A protein has these predicted regions:
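Short, charged, surface-exposed secondary-structure boundary motifs
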Residues: 29-30, 141-149
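Conserved metal-phosphate-binding beta-hairpin within the catalytic cores
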Residues: 5-11, 17, 85, 91
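Paired acidic/hydrophobic, glycine-rich loop segments that form the ligand-binding mouth/hinge
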Residues: 5, 132-134
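Catalytic domains of carbohydrate-active enzymes, especially glycoside hydrolases
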Residues: 1-11, 155-162
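Metal-dependent phosphodiesterase/phospholipase catalytic core, i.e.
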Residues: 21-132, 151-170
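Short catalytic/ligand-binding loop motif for oxyanion handling, primarily in non-cytosolic enzymes
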Residues: 14, 94, 121-122, 142-144
Length: 170
């Protein structure tokens, strides 16, 4: 059991919302290509367990039918699970599709959502006002500045959390 599951969302060429951190499928599957250039049908042909190594260093998930999931499948399979969602990139269609899915599955009260991209985060705030959200990087810097001057209550009353890695390797 977990209290909250953190996932990243991308949008495919055919407008499907998938659960994937990377912009491409190169690292996580036996395929190649950018998510935005591939349909979900094309992505689902590749083995998402191909490169994953278990604790013994074995590729035990290879050839086991593991595919990159649709966000909708996550909402169906885990209806009572709280989700911390990062929207990747700056595609307005991603926000619109995610809004539709979250609304259709009546999941607003179980979602914490945001994007590191400032413009994408503004779309999130506009389209998903009933979800909790976190700050983009530029908002985080402004948050720190405003906090330094003791003005947080005046300027920030809608976000729920700040996500800032203690360590960053990349």
């Amino acid at each position: 059991n977990v209290e909250m599951l953190e996932i990243d969302l991308q949008i495919t060429k055919d407008g499907k919302v998938i659960v994937l951190h990377d912009d491409s499928i190169d690292r996580t599957t036996n395929g190649k290509g950018n998510v935005i250039d591939l349909s979900y049908e094309e992505i689902a042909e590749f083995d998402a367990g191909y490169n994953f190594k278990d604790e013994e260093g074995e590729c035990s998930f290879r050839d086991q039918g593991v595919i990159i999931p649709l966000f909708e499948e996550v909402l169906k399979q885990l209806p009572n699970t709280y989700l911390n969602i990062e929207l990747k990139g700056n595609n307005p269609q991603l926000v619109e599709k995610v809004q539709l899915l979250i609304t259709n599955y009546n999941a607003e009260d179980k979602i914490l959502i945001g994007s590191a991209n400032y413009f994408q985060n503004k779309r999130v705030h506009k389209h998903l006002p009933n979800c909790g959200y976190y700050l983009s990087r530029p908002d985080l810097y402004l948050f720190l500045l405003v906090g330094y001057f003791g003005l947080l209550k005046k300027y920030w009353d809608k976000f729920l959390t700040v996500e800032a890695p203690i360590e960053y390797h990349g």
